[in-house]
């Protein structure tokens, strides 16, 4: 009540409405206009009275009163004197909170450079003056003079003079003949005297004339800054400060602690230093002190101001009393604890609580159990209001008492208040939007929150002590959003891949699986049941068991809703489950008449959701959960020692493998294979042995046994049931328990040759245990490190994609991407159907045989279409993609396609960028947290053969094969592929075969599925001859380019090419083998070059000089890297590397044109390769390749654009430049997907495409035309297109540019919004740049709006903003009408009125 009366006297000014925020450099006049007075003394408060000192840092006269409506001396108190200035102490009588907004200033006795513009790279002052930072610092810190006006002397303008040189010049020319200044005054003069228009014109002329790249870059940088100053209206001399602003005292408080000490903000210390030094300098100047003393004081003042703005940027960090660096103004903004991230983007929430969670299996999906104590505390305001309304209390105080005493009527009211008032539950870490969901609370006893088991997957929660936070949505709008958008019943599908996320797991799966098992020879086999009643009766009387094979009549409905009866071969367990299925024509009994593994249950729920809608699905899920729990409990499936079966054949397999390894050891001792080859073979052999033992073990576990007495089937192995159903445990874990643990990895990632032969059931020997500790510990260490890495990746992704919002329905783009199935090692890992589901077709999709239209252009591809597409065997489809979308701000709904979390076309306003970022980032954390589940056991990944994945006829593309001396077909081509065609001649599979592979089929052969097509040695790469003849060595000089290395352990020698460039004598050698005929003439290759084979470092020679070789024989081998284990460790950094668009370390070199390979003159230790184009209009392209890199092209080879000259991972920038956007997109999508696929994580392609779109938004200007840009500028792609359209209309010359790929960090920092960029990273740099350019932030993205405290322009906030815009436009129209009819005074009054309404 009192507050309301106060508000009458103290009306709040309506909040300003604004559409944009501008940042620029403050001029001295501006700083003075903010200030309420000058601070002259360094004192803070009086130590006895605790009142602020006059003219000090907390002065009440300048900043306002300490107590509301009370002057400092106490003469004026109370509201009635509001606005009076006390004549005794000079304090205005007003609210004390003005101390949070009133600023002061310090007038400096000498100008000081602003450290941000000086030291933040690139130095703005340096670039503008075209001087190096070192020189400027020399002037600023009083080491050198600078000549500003040489007059008629021999000195040059801007020449630096040391103290001595200055003295000599003064003696020589006289003091008034020239002007040389020192310190910040000098820089001030230089900046003030700059004529920016003239400089800009000169720079443009220079730019046009210069040819050197380096100079051009430098001129462009300078021109850019000059233009920034011209456009923004900033003056260069404002970068030198004569007045320092002082921030309001309540933002740098001084708090008395008990014991008479004070806690103070570091800023006060820093300000104190500035004031002290400034006052001392003033006094010294008044006293006319010697120049050297004044200079020293000026330098100290400069350092003090530097420390205030950015402590530690230059020189030593200034520390406080406790040796801790003081936090300067910059540090207040920077980093996780800075203003942006701590207070503006992350705020504390009232009306919230947290507690431990326990499982609530009897809850409905939309409910959660809330402890009464918590509910009472959280809903207090609502309870008070209700008590008041019902007349139980007349004041808040009374209501408070009632609630504190917990009177019975309070509990009744709590029940009323809580009814249908959703609360939000959140579990940290909130990695995706399903980490916060709304539930309806039900009151429970106890102190733990109850959580529905089905939502655990979404929260990634378990009940081993996890805690969750509860938040209460207060306003009606918030409650509405919570219910309609965030209710757990609305989040059935996973936003990352569109699969159900409300899926039973663990016990529930086990129970349902147990229900669906079929057993042989059970009692009552073959009985027929008419309905569920009969069946229940039979079950209760043990006539049949849950697993008996029976015939049952099942009741469903047809399309009209009439009941239909049908008889199925099934089991009673499955009938019980079928009872729960929603009655719908599209949900047949067959869907649960199968083994219910976790996969099948997920499919069933998905099917129900697609055909019966959300409500039915939710009811079905709840029922199926209860059924699962009940039967898991009934079944009593447990885990016993004897459930882990060790296969009898284990000893035999181990003995065989040990014999093999001994044989390899012998071969190595005889010198037939190298150390590396032996290692690879041993590791391979043990890997195969482990797999074999695992297979035998699984076969034993799976085996069905019968009881000899009753003849009934024995109970299945319970551990096998757990694993096979998907409830818990994997084959890998079972292998370690009952098979053999297998190979282990060292912390470096290499595999240890000796495996762990024991399993956990037998127990490990001491040595084995020691070997296994590596992996286990590395797993734990990795987990801790990677969680942070993955979180950082998510943060960068969110930042780059935050402004990708669905902003229109259709952009009308006529370009898109081509989708094809992804084939890996002959296996289809992602079918075309999976990839195009939920996307919009770009062109009509036609049936290849009948030619009828399956999907029209512009229609979304649904599940039913996918079935037809898969059956028809269509191999490539053009679809629309966010990547090629032409919407200006955001993405259009057509290009995006289906909203995966809803299963419908995406709505306008959906923040697809953030969803994409969360979908990619969330599993990153999952994966990293899951590295150690393998217990460090190694997985060897290397294939050495190729099997047909389909039946069909073989066709060889780019056929190039020869028969070698063993009579095998050997592949000689670099880009040869084996195609398998079906009966209609359609390609069913394409397999690339590597150079040197042995082929078992030839053109026209027919193959069966699983037949071997080719094999190769995965550990070495062969160098083969194409012609028959005699070998001769060239430049293979012992000790220089070739060394006989004797193996330490065997004494056998092998000849290896060594790095010949390390000695001066060998620098000109080109080690090679030549094939000659009998007469000693060098033979020619088919392509016309000589038969000379250049050898790289580490090649092992396989033939002796003079040996006779046939085509296809191996003359040398190059060892490959030994097999490393694959783990997401390679994964997360790999994903980050791809998103950051970094050039890989040894990146591939890609041919830019089609042509013929020629070898040029070598350059130092690089090999020069020239591609002569087939088209004479193009220039030849040169590449320099380090010698000693394994390089497989020969002189005269024909090469296609985009082929690899040097193997390795390609740099994404090269793909973009050479093959274009679509190839880049498919490369990035496939590479990133491969990492996730390896871990079994499904992410829809469109999420990755959205991020890649954000990385490809800029073009680099190559031809500026009349656009006003400078070549080399990065400009928004769509912005450039718009400017060009306008220029063409006006008949001017348009500009052109090449698309550039920016890494996600770079792209985030280059957003048009400086607020968003500053809150992301490198805050000082972003703000400095923005201030110089006088940037305007139009508040388009999400972050900017959160920071200024508005609704975000996405989702419901986007609609609200739109409505507000429409309303404002309407108001303006009405006012215009009024203006025309009546006077302007009335219209203005109306405008004020409307503004106030809007503000309220």
UniProtKB/Swiss-Prot annotation:
Residues that coordinate or bind Zn(2+) 2: 811, 885, 892, 895
EC number: 2.7.7.6
Cofactor note (record): Binds 1 Mg(2+) ion per subunit.
Keywords: DNA-directed RNA polymerase, Magnesium, Metal-binding, Nucleotidyltransferase, Transcription, Transferase, Zinc
GO biological process, one term: DNA-templated transcription
Cofactors named for this entry: Mg(2+); Zn(2+)
Catalytic reactions on record: RNA(n) + a ribonucleoside 5'-triphosphate = RNA(n+1) + diphosphate
Record-level GO cellular component terms: DNA-directed RNA polymerase complex
Assembly mode: The RNAP catalytic core consists of 2 alpha, 1 beta, 1 beta' and 1 omega subunit. When a sigma factor is associated with the core the holoenzyme is formed, which can initiate transcription.
Similarity-based family: Belongs to the RNA polymerase beta' chain family.
Functional note: DNA-dependent RNA polymerase catalyzes the transcription of DNA into RNA using the four ribonucleoside triphosphates as substrates.
Alphabetized HAMAP family for the sequence: RNApol_bact_RpoC
Name recorded for this polypeptide: DNA-directed RNA polymerase subunit beta'
Gene: rpoC
């Amino acid at each position: 009540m009192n507050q309301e009366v106060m508000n009458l006297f103290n009306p709040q000014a309506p909040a300003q409405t604004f559409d944009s925020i501008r940042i620029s450099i403050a001029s001295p006049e501006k700083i003075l206009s903010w200030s309420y007075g000058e601070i002259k003394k360094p004192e803070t408060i009086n130590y006895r009275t605790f009142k602020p000192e006059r003219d000090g840092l907390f002065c009440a006269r300048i900043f306002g009163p300490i107590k509301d409506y009370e002057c400092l001396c106490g003469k004026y108190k109370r509201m009635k004197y509001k606005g009076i200035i006390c004549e005794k102490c000079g304090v205005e009588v007003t609210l004390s909170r003005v101390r949070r907004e009133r600023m002061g200033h310090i007038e400096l006795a000498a100008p000081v450079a602003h450290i941000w513009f000086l030291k933040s790279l690139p130095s703005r002052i340096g670039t503008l003056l075209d001087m190096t930072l070192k020189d400027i610092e020399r002037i600023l810190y009083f080491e050198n003079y600078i000549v500003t006006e040489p007059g008629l002397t021999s000195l040059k303008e801007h020449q630096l003079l040391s103290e001595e040189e200055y003295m000599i010049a003064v003696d020589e020319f006289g003091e008034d003949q020239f002007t040389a200044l020192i310190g910040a005054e000098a820089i001030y003069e230089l900046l003030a005297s700059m004529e920016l228009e003239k400089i800009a014109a000169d720079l443009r002329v220079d730019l046009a004339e210069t040819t050197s790249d380096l100079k051009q870059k430098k001129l462009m940088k300078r021109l850019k800054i000059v233009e920034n100053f011209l456009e923004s209206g900033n003056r260069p001399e404002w970068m030198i400060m004569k007045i320092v602003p002082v921030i309001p005292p309540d933002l740098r408080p001084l708090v008395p602690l008990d014991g008479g000490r004070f806690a103070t903000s570091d800023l006060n210390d820093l300000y104190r230093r500035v004031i002290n030094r400034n006052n001392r300098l003033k006094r010294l100047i008044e006293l006319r002190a010697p120049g050297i003393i004044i200079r020293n004081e000026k330098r100290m003042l400069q350092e003090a101001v530097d420390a205030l703005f950015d402590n530690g940027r230059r020189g030593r960090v200034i520390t406080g009393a406790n040796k801790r660096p003081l936090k300067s103004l910059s540090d207040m903004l920077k980093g996780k604890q800075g203003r942006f991230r701590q207070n503006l983007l992350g705020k504390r929430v009232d009306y919230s609580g947290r507690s431990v969670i326990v499982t609530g299996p009897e809850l409905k999906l939309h409910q959660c159990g809330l402890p009464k104590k918590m509910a009472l505390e959280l809903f207090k305001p609502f309870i008070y209001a209700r008590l008041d309304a019902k007349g139980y209390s007349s004041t808040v105080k009374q209501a408070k008492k009632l609630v504190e005493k917990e009177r019975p009527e309070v509990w009744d009211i709590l029940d009323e208040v809580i009814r249908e008032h959703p609360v939000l539950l959140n579990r940290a870490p909130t990695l995706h939007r399903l980490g916060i969901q709304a539930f309806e609370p039900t009151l429970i006893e106890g102190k733990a929150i109850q959580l529905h088991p089905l939502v655990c997957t979404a929260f990634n929660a378990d009940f081993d002590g996890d805690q969750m936070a509860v938040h209460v949505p207060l306003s009606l709008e918030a409650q509405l959003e919570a219910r309609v958008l965030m209710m757990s019943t609305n989040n059935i599908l996973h936003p990352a891949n569109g699969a159900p996320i409300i899926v039973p797991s663990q016990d529930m799966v086990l129970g349902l699986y147990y229900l669906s098992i079929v057993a042989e020879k059970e009692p009552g086999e073959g009985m027929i049941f008419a309905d569920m009643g009969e069946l229940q009766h039979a079950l209760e009387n043990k006539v049949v068991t849950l697993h008996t094979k029976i015939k049952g009549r099942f009741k469903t409905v047809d399309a009209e809703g009439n009941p239909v009866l049908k008889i199925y071969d099934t089991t009673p367990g499955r009938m019980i489950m079928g009872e729960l299925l929603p009655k719908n024509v599209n949900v047949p009994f067959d869907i649960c008449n199968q083994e219910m593994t976790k996969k099948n249950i997920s499919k069933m729920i998905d099917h129900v959701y697609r055909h019966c809608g959300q409500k039915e699905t939710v009811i079905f899920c709840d029922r199926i959960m209860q059924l699962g729990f009940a039967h898991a409990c009934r079944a009593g499936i447990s885990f016993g020692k004897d459930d882990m079966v060790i296969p009898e054949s284990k000893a035999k397999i181990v003995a065989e493998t040990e014999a093999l390894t001994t044989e390899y050891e012998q071969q190595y001792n005889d010198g037939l294979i190298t150390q590396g080859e032996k290692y690879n073979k041993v590791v391979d052999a043990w890997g195969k042995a482990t797999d074999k033992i695992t297979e035998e073990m699984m076969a034993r576990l799976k085996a069905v046994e019968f009881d000899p007495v009753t003849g009934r089937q024995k109970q299945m192995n319970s551990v096998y049931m757990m694993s096979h159903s998907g409830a818990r445990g994997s084959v890998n874990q079972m292998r370690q328990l009952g098979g053999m643990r297998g190979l282990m990895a060292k912390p470096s990632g290499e595999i240890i040759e000796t495996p762990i032969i024991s399993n956990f059931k037998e127990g490990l020997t001491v040595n084995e245990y020691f070997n296994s500790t590596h992996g286990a510990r590395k797993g734990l260490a990795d987990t801790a490190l990677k969680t942070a890495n993955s979180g950082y990746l998510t943060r960068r992704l969110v930042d780059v994609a935050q402004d990708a919002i669905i902003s229109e329905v259709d952009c009308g783009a006529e370009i898109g991407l081509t989708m094809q199935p992804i084939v890996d090692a002959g296996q289809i890992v992602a079918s075309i159907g999976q990839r195009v589901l939920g996307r919009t077709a770009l062109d009509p999709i036609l049936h290849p045989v009948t030619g009828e239209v399956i999907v029209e252009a512009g229609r979304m591809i649904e599940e039913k279409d996918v079935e037809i597409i898969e059956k028809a065997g269509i191999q490539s489809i053009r679809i629309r993609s966010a990547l090629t979308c032409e919407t200006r701000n955001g993405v259009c709904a057509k290009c995006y396609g289906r909203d995966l979390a809803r299963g419908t076309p995406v709505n306008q306003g959906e923040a697809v960028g953030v969803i994409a970022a969360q979908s990619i980032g969330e599993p990153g954390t999952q994966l990293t947290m899951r590295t150690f589940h393998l217990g460090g056991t190694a997985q060897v990944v290397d294939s050495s053969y190729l099997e047909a994945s389909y039946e069909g006829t073989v066709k060889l593309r780019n056929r190039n094969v020869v028969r070698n001396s063993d009579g095998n077909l050997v592949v000689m081509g670099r880009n040869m592929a084996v195609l398998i065609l079906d009966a209609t001649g359609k390609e069913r599979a394409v397999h690339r075969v590597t150079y040197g592979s042995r082929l078992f089929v030839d053109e026209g052969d027919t193959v069966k599925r699983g037949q071997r097509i080719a094999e190769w040695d995965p550990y070495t790469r062969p160098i083969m001859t194409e012609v028959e003849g005699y070998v001769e060595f060239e430049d293979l000089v012992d000790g220089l380019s070739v060394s006989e290395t004797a193996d330490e352990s065997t004494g056998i020698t092998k000849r290896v090419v060594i790095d010949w460039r390390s000695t001066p004598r060998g620098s000109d050698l080109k080690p090679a083998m030549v094939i000659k005929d009998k007469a000693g003439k060098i033979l020619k290759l088919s392509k016309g070059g000589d038969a000379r084979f250049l050898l790289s470092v580490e090649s092992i020679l396989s033939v002796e000089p003079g040996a006779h070789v046939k085509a296809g024989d191996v003359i040398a081998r190059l060892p490959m890297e030994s097999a490393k284990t694959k783990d997401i460790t390679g994964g997360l950094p790999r994903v980050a590397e791809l998103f950051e668009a970094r050039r890989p370390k040894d990146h591939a070199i890609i041919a830019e044109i089609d042509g013929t390979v020629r070898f040029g003159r070598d350059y130092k230790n690089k090999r020069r390769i020239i591609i002569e184009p087939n088209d004479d209009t193009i220039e030849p392209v040169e590449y320099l390749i380090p010698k000693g890199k394994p390089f497989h092209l020969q002189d005269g080879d024909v090469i296609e654009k985009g082929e690899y000259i040097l193997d390795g991972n390609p740099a994404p920038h090269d793909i973009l430049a050479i093959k274009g956007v679509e190839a880049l997109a498919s490369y990035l999508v496939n590479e990133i997907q491969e990492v996730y696929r390896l871990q079994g994580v499904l992410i829809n392609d469109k999420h990755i495409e959205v991020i890649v779109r954000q990385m490809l938004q800029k073009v680099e200007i190559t031809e500026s035309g009349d656009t006003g840009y400078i070549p080399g500028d990065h400009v928004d792609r769509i912005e450039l297109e718009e400017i060009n359209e306008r220029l063409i209309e006006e008949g001017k010359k348009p500009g052109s540019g090449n698309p550039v790929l920016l890494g996600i960090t770079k792209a985030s920092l280059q957003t048009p919004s400086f607020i968003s960029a500053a809150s992301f990273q490198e805050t000082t740099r972003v703000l400095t740049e923005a201030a110089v350019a006088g940037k305007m932030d139009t508040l388009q993205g999400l972050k900017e709006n959160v920071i200024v405290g508005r609704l975000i322009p996405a989702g419901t906030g986007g609609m609200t903003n739109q409505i507000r815009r429409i309303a404002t436009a309407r108001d303006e129209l009405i006012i215009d009408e009024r203006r025309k009819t009546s006077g302007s005074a009335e219209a203005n009054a109306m405008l004020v009125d409307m503004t106030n309404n809007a503000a309220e």
